[in-house]
Regions:
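Core SAM-dependent methyltransferase catalytic element
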Residues: 106, 110-135
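Short conserved AdoMet
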Residues: 32, 46, 134
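A short acidic, Gly/Pro-enriched loop at the edge of an enzyme's catalytic core
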Residues: 7-22
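A short glycine-rich, Lys/Arg-flanked "PGG" loop and its adjoining helix->strand segment in the class I
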Residues: 35-50
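C-terminal alpha-helical "lid/dimerization" subdomain adjacent to the S-adenosyl-L-methionine
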Residues: 58-108, 112, 118
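Short loop/edge segments at beta-strand edges and connector loops
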Residues: 6-7, 121
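A short SAM/SAH-binding and catalytic strip from SAM-dependent methyltransferases
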Residues: 20-34, 57
Length: 135
């Protein structure tokens, strides 16, 4: 069975060792203290539980990166044209640029006691899936 929750990732209202999986998609970079959130993820996972995180990342191919930077600069303009506001789209681009690289995020996950860490780039590294286990 799957149950969906929406809570403060830095202070989860769950018991220790309660979940088999902890997933988060495009949310980790919006959390004030990512380190605290990962600590909470570890706390609520059962031993043998798995963390899966899908998040924007750093493009590894230089040619693709140049196109992605140009595309990223147009997103706020398109947002302003379509919905009349550019600020949410500027926030999106800034939060992506300021977030951890794949390896930096992997190290932060490791710092929070996770093991068997890995990440997989998708779309040339525009996004990455990080995976880790609580052993």
């Amino acid at each position: 069975n799957v149950k969906w929750y929406c809570n403060n990732a830095e202070n989860l209202p769950f018991k220790n060792n309660e979940f088999d999986y902890y997933t988060i998609s495009f949310g980790l970079r919006n959390i004030d203290n990512v380190d605290n959130a990962l600590g909470e993820a570890f706390r609520v996972l059962k031993p043998g539980g798995r963390l899966l995180c899908l998040e924007f990342s750093k493009v590894k191919n230089e040619i693709l990166n140049q196109f992605y930077k140009i595309y990223s600069k147009t997103i706020p303009k398109i947002g302003k044209f379509i919905v009349g506001k550019s600020e949410p789209y500027e926030y999106l681009i800034n939060s992506i640029e300021e977030f951890y690289s794949q390896k930096e995020l992997l190290e932060l996950i490791k710092k929070n006691n996770f093991t068997n860490l890995s990440f997989r780039n998708l779309s040339g590294g525009i996004v990455a899936i990080h995976s880790a286990w609580k052993i």
